[in-house]
Amino acid sequence: HALIEEYKEKVAATQTDKYDRVVMLYTQDEDAHTSYIKAAEDKGYDVLLFDQPVIDTHFIQHLENKLENVTFVRVDSDIPENLIQKDEELESVLSEEQQEKVKVLFEEALGEDDKSKLQMKALSPNSHPVMITRPEFMRRMQEMQAMQGMDMSGMGDFYNVVINTNHPLVAEKLIKMRSPEKKEKFASYLYNLARLNQHM
């Protein structure tokens, strides 16, 4: 318990959210989440490695209940800017009209996918152009149901597709392409890169 308190003090300065909770970022698969870990570390965050079978969703919830003002968030559950909720917001370099055009391109790239939610976000130009995240709450619920042997086929695998409207590949290259076919192919290419990043 002393080690957890020491770690909490170590990360409190950079990993305290707007609700005054210390957010402990973690991964259970370092190889699968390499780019997410790097993105979090680039923001000055520290990521715990929970690669032992005993550290499961139940154990994490037990820790959250036991520790005061602490929450655990898996590093791939949201974009780096939202892992630790702060009141900071960037503005998009794209107009609302341009954002809508980009959104339509990515909706076509996703096709009829009812398991995903498309979001346009003004993020750092250094973040990925497109990111796929799995909400912490949904993922935990699925893991708990799987451990209890419950059928989750009706739930599906829900995820967010986040388009970084400030990334040069979106804000400059994609917007300035003249050919609609090239725009569609490029949007699809960026989406597929994000899927590869999530091992989908």
Positions of the model-derived regions?
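Long, intrinsically disordered, charge-dense linkers/tails
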Residues: 1-200
